[in-house]
Design a protein with these regions (language model features):
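N-terminal signal-anchor transmembrane helix specifying type II single-pass membrane topology
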Residues: 2-51
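Oxyanion-hole/transition-state-stabilizing segment in secreted/luminal serine hydrolases
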Residues: 138, 145-146, 150, 206-239
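Extracellular serine-dependent O-acyl
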Residues: 121, 257-262, 274-322, 337-356
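Active-site segments of SGNH/GDSL-like serine hydrolases
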Residues: 227-231, 246-277
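Serine-esterase "nucleophile elbow" of acetyl-processing enzymes
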Residues: 90-199, 214-218, 446-456, 464, ...
Length: 527
């Protein structure tokens, strides 16, 4: 009996709950319908609103309007969000440069962008170009940037060179007032003309350009491309000169955009060249984007070695880097074309992103949208310190390859000028030959830059500063590395500010296995 009553009570309770829920749903539907018919709001506490006192605030008006006007909002928000997603996705490498994706594949194109960073400097420079301001483009690179292997009439400046391809494309998009200036004596931006300055030097790396970059392109350069990875050894000492080079570029008053280009070669002891190992971390520290032909092509070439013949240059029959008629150190026409298209695609990607950013912001104020930032106060290659600040560096260079500050002795006995193609030196081959230079320093550092090789028969020289012969350095031109390139040495780093004399003497002793003595000086540098 009791169980029966309990079951009946439970059934009534469930019925009452269902009825209550249904009644509340019906009431809500009626309220919404009431509002849609424009019959005013309904006060849940006291019945229908008294419309005779419209100027008296009603606490239920807000609730009614929320139902009436805010209900469609989520649909509109979703639509807007989807549109923005489409815009963002439209700024993709394969959309702005589909032909590159077709050639190397989307994955390899993405790999080519080794480091993107904020791109604020690059976007600032592109924003100036889009406003119609003239621009200068400079290159700090080695023999690849000079176009060795293109086998054209003008490898360095001709239209087949990858840097010239980039410049011509930019000049077409953002033409100056007159004809573009291809390696003029100096900047012609004052005349409204765009300028191309290929400052590349064969057989040098970051240690040369960290001190001598002012000799090879104007200080009001807007776009700077670095291409020294192939010429760098896989040693930690490569990092600091590369860092000093970056700081020197980024500290220019013209606020240049700097892009680090990393090439590819198959003629060295390591499959991946030293710069591809030693440069990326430093570039990231300074927010400098890096584009890598090595990353783009290496997977394809490892799977299909015959592609080396497509992307690299025809080699000299007696060349040390020539294998089966192909120069495995210098890319050819197709390699230059691909590298240029990768860079152009990356620049297009930035301009696409700029369109989106400026549309969303409703303006194109450069300083607000693309803040410049500042150089890190410490060196990436230095030790952490709570308060230390790296001083601004103003390097000075006397170079055999410079038209501005040519390396010229104040005293000379047995040394002479000599050049091979675009490389210039002061050389001596008779032991006992002496030469003296004068150079100024502000922070007390003087460096000598000289060539090293395993095959040219290089000997030894002794160099010192002022009369401090006891602090002389013995420099060996010979080494067993597969590079014929320049290397720097710190002659002194403790000198007082002012002008100092640097002396060098060719020695009888030599490290060359063949007993030869020739020694080549490229430049003298100071800070």
């Amino acid at each position: 009996m009791n169980n029966s009553r309990l079951s009946l009570s439970s059934g009534r309770l469930r019925f009452l709950l269902r009825t209550s829920v249904l009644a509340n749903v019906v009431l809500l539907v009626l309220l919404v319908r009431w509002a849609d018919l424009g019959l005013g709001s309904f006060d849940l506490a006291g019945g229908r609103e008294d419309t005779r006192h419209a100027d008296v605030p009603q606490r239920t008006v807000t609730r009614t309007r929320t139902v009436k006007f805010e209900a469609p909002a989520p649909t509109e928000t979703v639509i807007q969000t989807k549109e923005k997603v489409v815009e963002i996705n439209s700024c993709s490498l394969c959309k702005v440069a589909p032909h590159v994706c077709q050639e190397i594949g989307e994955d390899n194109f993405r790999r080519a962008v080794g480091f993107m960073g904020s791109n604020n400097r690059l976007r600032r420079a592109l924003a100036r170009l889009r406003r119609g301001q003239p621009f200068n483009m400079g290159i700090a690179g080695g023999s690849v940037s000079l176009g060795h292997g293109l086998h054209t009439d003008d490898e360095e400046r001709g239209p087949e060179n990858m840097h010239r391809q980039i410049f011509d494309w930019l000049n077409e998009k953002f033409p100056g007032k007159g004809e573009p200036a291809i390696e003029p004596e100096g900047s012609l931006k004052a005349e409204g003309r765009n300028g191309f300055f290929n400052g590349a030097q064969g057989g040098v790396g970051g240690d040369y350009f960290s001190m001598c970059f002012k000799e090879h392109f104007p200080l009001d350069t807007d776009l700077l491309f670095i291409e020294t990875a192939v010429n760098e050894e896989n040693e930690l000492f490569v990092q600091k000169p590369f860092e000093l080079m970056l700081r020197g570029f980024l500290d220019l008053k013209s606020e240049p955009a700097v892009i680090n280009l990393q090439g590819i070669a198959f003629s060295f002891r390591q499959l991946v060249t030293g710069g591809n190992f030693q440069q990326p971390g430093v570039a990231q520290f300074y927010d400098v984007p890096s584009l890598s032909l090595n990353n783009a092509l290496m997977p394809k070439i490892l799977d299909q070695p015959s592609l080396i013949a497509e992307y690299f240059a025809e080699g000299d029959t007696d060349g040390r880097s020539t294998v089966d008629g192909i120069d495995r150190r210098h890319i050819g026409l197709k390699g230059h074309k691909l590298f240029a298209e990768i860079v152009k695609g990356y620049l297009e990607l930035q301009m696409c992103e700029m369109d989106r950013i400026e549309e969303e912001a409703g303006h194109n104020h450069i300083d607000e949208l693309y803040p410049l930032g500042h150089l890190p106060r410490l060196l990436a290659t230095g030790k952490y310190d709570e308060t230390a600040v790296t001083p601004r560096m103003d390097p000075f260079c006397l170079s055999a390859n410079s038209k501005k500050n040519k390396l010229s002795p104040v005293e000379n006995d047995g040394w002479r000028e000599w050049s091979w193609k675009d490389k210039h030196y002061l050389i001596a081959d008779k032991p006992g030959s002496k030469i003296t230079f004068e150079i100024k320093t502000g922070l007390g550092l003087i460096q000598l830059f000289y060539q090293r090789s395993a095959v040219y028969g290089f000997g030894n020289a002794k160099c010192w500063v002022n009369d401090d012969v006891d602090k002389a350095h013995t420099l060996e031109g010979y080494w067993d590395e597969p590079f014929n390139i320049g290397r720097s040495v710190d002659l002194r780093d403790d000198l007082p500010p002012g002008t100092h004399k640097v002396h060098c003497e060719l020695l009888e002793s030599t490290a060359d296995p063949g007993g030869k003595h020739e020694f080549r000086i490229i430049s003298l540098m100071s800070i």
